[in-house]
């Protein structure tokens, strides 16, 4: 469930709810969290999402919780299967705290958000 709005700088911002009840071990029905706020842009007919400039200082190039593989990547502590990304990964940025990891591939061309 995403909320989209136009901010005072004219940016289109998306914040999404990431539900957690489908993950193993969660027993409460209200588990989840909000995503990192993303600026949404249309570039060459494709929608991109990238963290707003106010939180970009939190982005990293690597993370011990993410294992890169030849066919994509796997997020540790996630009960999901490996993510298969078809195409060359030119740029990979990661933001993580104790509850969520968000992976931005190729400047926000693809985004993967996982509760940990």
Locations of the language-model features?
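Beta-rich accessory regions
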Residues: 1-116
């Amino acid at each position: 469930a995403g909320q989209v709005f136009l901010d005072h700088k004219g940016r289109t911002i998306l914040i999404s709810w990431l539900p957690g009840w489908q993950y193993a071990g969660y027993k409460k029905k209200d588990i989840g969290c909000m995503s990192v706020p993303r600026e949404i842009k249309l570039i060459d007919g494709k929608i991109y999402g990238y963290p707003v400039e106010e939180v970009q200082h939190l982005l990293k190039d690597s993370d011990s919780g993410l294992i890169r593989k030849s066919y994509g990547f796997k997020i540790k502590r996630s009960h999901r299967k490996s993510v298969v990304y078809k195409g060359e990964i030119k740029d990979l940025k990661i933001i993580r705290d104790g509850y969520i990891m968000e992976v931005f591939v190729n400047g926000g061309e693809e985004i993967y958000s996982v509760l940990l």
